[in-house]
């Protein structure tokens, strides 16, 4: 049995023939043109066709993956509509008398080089990748070349690619695409996250799969352990068929837990919740037996609108989610705009590092007219369910007090106007900045609850962009530095009689879950498709056995891998 090893990105086992997702030849020759107007018209047609493509892909992505994953295509369309980008291309055509292909390449190369040179700026690195993806699409229309369309796959296959762009992944049809394997990527890359949303096995970061496999080769993909079996024998296929059936049986057992509580062997109860981006995601939450919504990302209300959403529009969205959850808690995060989330109708200053700049609560406190509108809508909606409000990107106690003060002010105004507001309204904050994790004991006196955002907390603590492959090895959720911060937050909240949740990727991670249960995390919020798996895992745990495990994990010698093995060994007999 010959195996190729990679990073297990999405659980499951699949056997099928390889489908090579090969990028077409987009080479061209530089040429001098005499009719600039005609060439600019060619460019405009290619831009329009590309925008049309992206609108279609975005719709497919929203239906199959949800609004959060579809949002990346909004960024792509914004590039195509950016006058600085398109104007520079037109300028090249007019001034240098070059064909549209050459003008596009020169301008795109300049933008990409500028962004990629900012190695400490995650936002700019992501924009560079977006420009490459968009440029490829526009160039294909200029050349009359068809890009690969995974949506046209009509037989059972395993997709093999050097990498999968968000556009590629969004078009994968789970009926026929049984799995995918790539040369590059990590567990937190766009393609990996989308694979988990689609519930298809995936392995990334193999480095050589496109060299080791050719179209039509029979493969087995083990997305649980990160193995690709090349040229499997009948015995190999039979062995993995048994494993696949065992996994299917396991999922069927998970289904039985839909209406059960999340309880450990020794009777400790936890809340397993789901994250959503829009009211459309509510169906998945209910289908998977979530006990709450631990994170409602309200920024998509703003991103899916051509203008600032009105108070009434927001009220209706919040009300529909609260009513849909039928009394189960809903934690709503106030607007988290900035960083990688920009609004065409709300210009933000250009910054060297937007992720550490004017974003989230910093915008809300500065533009309290926008903030107050959202808070009024939330307060009005509080009558229709169990609402929890939390503020993102809080760094100081003063920020939290200011935000809560504005909330209390709007609440008083509504009551004075004769409107009712729920008297069971908790107000908390995201813990995603190391400063707030370190000083959790001070914040715990002010808040009703904490919600730990591990995606940003890990990046800021380790000074490593999780989307940058050069430093992604430092994105270490099991690093003892991260574990100590998390434990500090949980302990601080409990000391004050408050509760702590987690809404980052780590909450649904099979290695992190036993550690988090041992630390006493109260609420685990994750992708809806992970809820039953985590609930099942909890039933195998005895909290009395976890104290020593946690103590060892927070004191290892800065080794992410050591803690991973520690938990894996611990779970073998459970």
Curated annotation (Swiss-Prot):
Keywords: Cytoplasm, Kinase, Magnesium, Metal-binding, Phosphotransferase system, Sugar transport, Transferase, Transport
Catalytic activity: L-histidyl-[protein] + phosphoenolpyruvate = N(pros)-phospho-L-histidyl-[protein] + pyruvate
Family, as annotated: Belongs to the PEP-utilizing enzyme family.
Residues holding Mg(2+): 432, 456
Gene Ontology molecular functions: kinase activity; metal ion binding; phosphoenolpyruvate-protein phosphotransferase activity
Cross-referenced Pfam families: PEP-utilisers_N, PEP-utilizers, PEP-utilizers_C
Gene field: ptsI
Binding site for phosphoenolpyruvate: 297, 333, 455-456, 466
Note from the entry: The reaction takes place in three steps, mediated by a phosphocarrier histidine residue located on the surface of the central domain. The two first partial reactions are catalyzed at an active site located on the N-terminal domain, and the third partial reaction is catalyzed at an active site located on the C-terminal domain. For catalytic turnover, the central domain swivels from the concave surface of the N-terminal domain to that of the C-terminal domain.
Xref: InterPro entries: PEP-util_enz_mobile_dom, PEP-utilizing_PTS_enzyme, PEP_util_AS, PEP_util_C, PEP_util_CS, Phosphohistidine_dom_sf, PTS_EI, PTS_EI-like
PROSITE patterns assigned: PEP_ENZYMES_2, PEP_ENZYMES_PHOS_SITE
Protein name per its UniProtKB record: Phosphoenolpyruvate-protein phosphotransferase
Record-annotated active site: 190, 503
Reported function: General (non sugar-specific) component of the phosphoenolpyruvate-dependent sugar phosphotransferase system (sugar PTS). This major carbohydrate active-transport system catalyzes the phosphorylation of incoming sugar substrates concomitantly with their translocation across the cell membrane. Enzyme I transfers the phosphoryl group from phosphoenolpyruvate (PEP) to the phosphoryl carrier protein (HPr).
Record PANTHER family: PHOSPHOENOLPYRUVATE-PROTEIN PHOSPHOTRANSFERASE
Domain notes: The N-terminal domain contains the HPr binding site, the central domain the pyrophosphate/phosphate carrier histidine, and the C-terminal domain the pyruvate binding site.
Oligomeric and partner information: Homodimer.
Cofactor(s) listed in the protein's UniProt record: Mg(2+)
GO cellular component term, pick one: cytoplasm
EC number: 2.7.3.9
Record-level GO BP terms: phosphoenolpyruvate-dependent sugar phosphotransferase system
Location of this chain's protein in the cell: Cytoplasm
Enzyme class: transferase
